[in-house]
């Protein structure tokens, strides 16, 4: 009788151990289960452009709480234009400038819990190219222009081997638009070098610049003026197959 009771007790202990191990296994499975993937059909995006102020808002709703949000140029080698974190309600509002002479095709990248989704086919219209050729010529020749690296950026990366990223965001430089289509490009940092034999032209509101860097010739073509005042010059320019936004201050 005593042996039978002992066997029953051992059997109950074994059963309890098995149940405990099964429960732990389920807990482990749940802890390793991937978080729900953001669903682009559920994320809502509204784009509103104001051509009077040349600004746009991109309103995001229904994203996962505190998800990472990135607005990216939806073309080959396109860079992120802005990044943010959704609030606890999964909402955020981006504010972006419209670019003169350039339509921005964007996608929203939503990342949460190691997974991601995209919302495509977002378009910001091009702003009007407001300056005439004469205004551009007079404005550019009115000052020596020194770069502001912190406000210059790469919008589309180039495929070549030249370090144009350093030209855009690191090199302190000056542009001088002189009479008779003469152009001087001066690098102030990280090295000091002047290239006085360049040329520039303006036609149909677009500027082309032929100059050089220490590695050889460089062309800035199809350049669109974004802002031109007595204090600031902002230009959107193409170098090889890259697209750069360059900001300068008058000296």
Feature-to-residue mapping (PLM):
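Bacterial N-terminal signal peptides that target proteins for export
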Residues: 2-12
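Bacterial lipoprotein signal-peptidase II cleavage site
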Residues: 25-33
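Residue-level signal for mature regions of secreted extracellular proteins and peptides
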Residues: 17-18, 193
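Lipid interaction determinants
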Residues: 34-59, 64-68, 74-78, 82, ...
């Amino acid at each position: 009788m005593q042996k039978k009771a002992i066997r029953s007790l051992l059997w109950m202990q074994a059963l309890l151990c098995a149940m405990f191990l099964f429960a732990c296994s389920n807990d482990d499975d749940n802890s390793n289960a991937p978080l729900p993937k953001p669903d682009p059909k559920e994320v809502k995006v509204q784009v509103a452009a104001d051509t009077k102020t040349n600004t746009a808002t991109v309103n995001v709703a229904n994203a996962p709480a505190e998800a990472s949000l990135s607005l990216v140029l939806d073309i080959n080698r396109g860079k992120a234009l802005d990044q943010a974190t959704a609030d606890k309600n999964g909402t955020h509002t981006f504010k972006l400038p419209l670019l003169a002479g350039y339509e921005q095709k964007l996608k929203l990248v939503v990342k949460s819990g190691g997974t991601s989704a995209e919302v495509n086919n977002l378009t910001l219209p091009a702003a009007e190219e407001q300056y005439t050729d004469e205004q551009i010529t007079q404005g550019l020749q009115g000052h020596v222009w020194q770069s502001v690296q912190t406000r210059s950026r790469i919008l589309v990366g180039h495929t070549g081997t030249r370090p144009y990223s350093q030209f855009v965001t690191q090199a302190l430089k000056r542009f001088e638009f002189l009479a008779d289509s003469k152009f001087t490009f001066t690098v102030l940092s990280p090295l000091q070098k002047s290239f006085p034999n360049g040329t520039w032209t303006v036609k149909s509101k677009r500027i082309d610049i032929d100059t050089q860097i220490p590695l050889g010739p460089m062309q800035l073509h199809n350049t669109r003026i974004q802002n031109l005042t007595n204090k600031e010059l902002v230009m959107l320019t193409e170098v090889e197959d890259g697209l750069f936004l360059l900001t300068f201050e008058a000296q």
